[in-house]
């Protein structure tokens, strides 16, 4: 296999023409299979030959990383095998995944590696199927998830200085790594596992404000027993300042950018080029257009990677879904949120279906493979089920008895600082603040991200980061002021992560008078809440209703449930829960118009459907065989 790059640097290794690409010996790695390889001593390494050409080796054999990203936490566990088999059948030899700290440790000191978060099971499954694994444990990962994968309880202390060697932050990282890394150790290559490399942090070159931080994180991995190749990952502008001695610097790109590769090569000219992220598409945000990228462009770019002998990872091979409240956000002319679908216009669709990109890449990879690629796994069928009539409802303020006991505070605090969840605050969802007022006037409150304001149960307006003032009309006697605040997704990139507390701060005033004595309810929408809600006295839903409310109906799927997509005509903004599972947010501004409903999350026959709609009741819910990801 001819490895390397750039004829201007290494004469005699010019890129091949497309015709000559079909050399059958070029990509024969059948002897390097994690489920069969018995001798384990060297692991993934970098070497340079007598001509100055650098390349990867695995157990002493030349090796090219052909990777694709699939995040286990965005895919139903029942479909991990399906997605990994499709990765392999396309011609890839490696799967990469981030590890989200905020999902594994939602409450400080309470770790969850079960079900969809069972990292060890995911990695061992990849090994069984014959795939190598690259892990990206952060602690920060970006990945368009809430706070870039950092747990929200870190924001309880405003002086923590995330992603630095600040004492509070590092202590939290150390405790997390003390729990996480022992799970990874037996999965490493030299211990018989499939993990051939581990990434140190993520894109620190775009953030860096602590020269000692990357060295600390690297040592935190090494001191706990990580022995495989270490990597860093940055955009071109950050590859030098985001690097750390002892780790291979890799680059993230949107296309084949020769100058970027030259820059990386000059920085470490005795190392092979590795593209840690080649973006096959992009994420969508609410109110924007759906992003698409040409399949022909993807094929051409990856062909050029091959022709130059560059190792690469496709981000994303399969994007999956931002189930629940896990989506992130970013700041561009105000706060903007990532949609529920993480389809990403990836090689495999959100529901695991083949795309034009998939077939073009499979054909390309097959042309350079010494052995036939595995057969294509069958597609998972999609179904159309009878429409769901949401016949019963509960206005928001009727469900308060079914929530956990409220918190009584003199002045409001952000959701992260609520004294709940063993001192960890509230990570996701909504918060309802209530206090009694006896006069009207100008209400001023700093809100993150959006708030609906009520007098008793009557809506009087909206607050958000661009509108922190609302006039309250003259009132008779005293009334209950209610402010319902939603966390729409914490920013996942840039220095702004330091100040991403959600909810209300202490300064809530009317005509400059500070409001006091708040009752605060947490609406985190956990499974236990929906179990309690089953016993509520649901009412017959009217034809129309304005204001936040829960609606309940039943979806009948027959004896053999399978995947479908939910479409909510005439509904405006809210969340859908199937048998207590949060499918994610819907919003009529688009571009996403359907929600993916995995078949394994359905029961035979009847399934509970609960919709929390914030604005105004719609009519019914339809099911479809295909998604609608653009207006």
From Swiss-Prot:
Gene Ontology CC: vacuole
Species of the source: Rattus norvegicus
Enzyme class: hydrolase
Family as reported in the entry's similarity comment: Belongs to the glycosyl hydrolase 35 family.
Record's protein name: Beta-galactosidase-1-like protein 3
Statement: the UniProt record of this protein carries the keyword Hydrolase: yes
EC number of the protein: 3.2.1.-
Molecular function, one GO term: beta-galactosidase activity
Pfam families: BetaGal_ABD_1 (PF21317), BetaGal_gal-bd (PF21467), Glyco_hydro_35 (PF01301)
Record GO biological process: galactose catabolic process
PANTHER family reported for this sequence: BETA-GALACTOSIDASE RELATED
Domain of life: Eukaryota
Active site: 203, 277
Keyword Hydrolase: yes
């Amino acid at each position: 296999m001819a490895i390397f790059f750039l004829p201007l640097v290494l004469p005699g290794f010019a890129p091949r023409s497309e015709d000559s690409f079909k050399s059958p010996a070029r990509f024969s790695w059948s002897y390097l299979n994690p489920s069969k390889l018995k001798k384990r001593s060297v692991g993934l390494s970098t070497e340079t030959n007598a001509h100055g050409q650098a390349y990867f080796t695995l157990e002493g054999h030349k090796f090219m990383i052909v990777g694709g990203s699939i995040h286990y936490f965005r895919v139903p566990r029942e479909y991990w095998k399906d997605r990994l088999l499709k990765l392999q059948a396309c011609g890839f030899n490696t799967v990469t995944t981030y590890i989200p700290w905020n999902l594994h440790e939602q409450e400080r000191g309470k770790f969850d590696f079960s079900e969809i978060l069972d990292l060890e099971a995911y990695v061992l499954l990849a090994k069984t199927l014959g795939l190598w694994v690259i892990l990206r444990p952060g602690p920060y990962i970006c990945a368009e998830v809430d706070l870039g994968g950092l747990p929200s309880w870190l924001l309880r202390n405003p002086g923590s200085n995330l992603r630095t060697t600040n004492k509070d932050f590092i202590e939290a990282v150390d405790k997390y790594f003390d729990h996480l890394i022992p799970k990874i150790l037996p999965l490493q290559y030299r211990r018989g596992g499939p993990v051939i490399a581990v990434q140190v942090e993520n894109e620190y070159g775009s953030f860096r404000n602590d020269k000692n931080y990357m060295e600390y994180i690297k040592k935190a991995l090494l001191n706990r027993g990580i022995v495989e190749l270490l990597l860093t990952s940055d955009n071109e502008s950050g590859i030098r300042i985001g690097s750390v001695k002892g780790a291979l610097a890799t680059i993230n790109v949107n296309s084949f950018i020769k100058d970027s590769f030259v820059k990386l090569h000059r920085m470490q000219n005795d190392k092979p080029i590795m593209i840690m992220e080649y973006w096959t598409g992009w994420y969508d945000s609410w109110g924007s257009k759906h992003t698409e990228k040409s399949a022909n462009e993807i094929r051409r770019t990856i062909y050029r990677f091959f022709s130059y002998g560059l190792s690469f990872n496709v981000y994303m091979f399969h994007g999956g879904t931002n189930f629940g409240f896990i989506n992130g956000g970013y700041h561009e002319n105000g706060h903007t949120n990532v949609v529920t679908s993480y389809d990403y216009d990836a090689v495999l669709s959100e529901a695991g279906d083949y795309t034009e990109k998939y077939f073009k890449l499979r054909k390309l990879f097959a042309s350079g493979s010494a052995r036939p690629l595995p057969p294509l796994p069958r597609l998972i069928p999609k179904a159309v089920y009878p429409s769901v009539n949401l016949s019963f409802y509960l206005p928001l303020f009727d469900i308060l008895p079914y929530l956990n006991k409220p918190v009584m505070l003199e002045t409001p605090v952000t959701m992260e600082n609520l004294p709940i969840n063993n001192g960890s605050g509230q990570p996701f969802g909504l918060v309802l603040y209530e206090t009694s007022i006896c006069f009207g006037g100008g209400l001023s409150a700093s809100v993150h991200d959006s708030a609906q304001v009520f007098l008793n149960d009557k809506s009087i307006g909206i607050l958000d980061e661009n509108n922190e003032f609302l006039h309250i009309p003259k009132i008779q006697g005293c009334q209950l002021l209610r402010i319902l605040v939603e966390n729409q997704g914490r920013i996942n990139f840039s220095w702004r992560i330091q100040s991403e507390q959600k909810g209300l701060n202490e300064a809530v005033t009317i005509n400059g008078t500070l409001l006091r004595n708040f009752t605060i309810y947490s609406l985190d929408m956990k499974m236990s809440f929906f179990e309690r809600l089953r016993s509520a006295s649901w009412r017959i839903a009217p034809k129309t209703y304005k204001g936040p409310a829960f609606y309940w109906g039943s979806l009948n799927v027959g004896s053999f449930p399978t995947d479908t997509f939910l479409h909510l005509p005439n509904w405006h903004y809210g969340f859908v829960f199937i048998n207590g599972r949060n499918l994610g947010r819907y919003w009529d501004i688009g571009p996403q118009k359907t929600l993916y409903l995995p078949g394994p999350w359905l029961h035979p026959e009847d399934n509970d459907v609960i919709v929390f709609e914030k604005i105004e009741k719609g009519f019914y819910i339809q099911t479809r065989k295909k998604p609608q990801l653009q207006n």
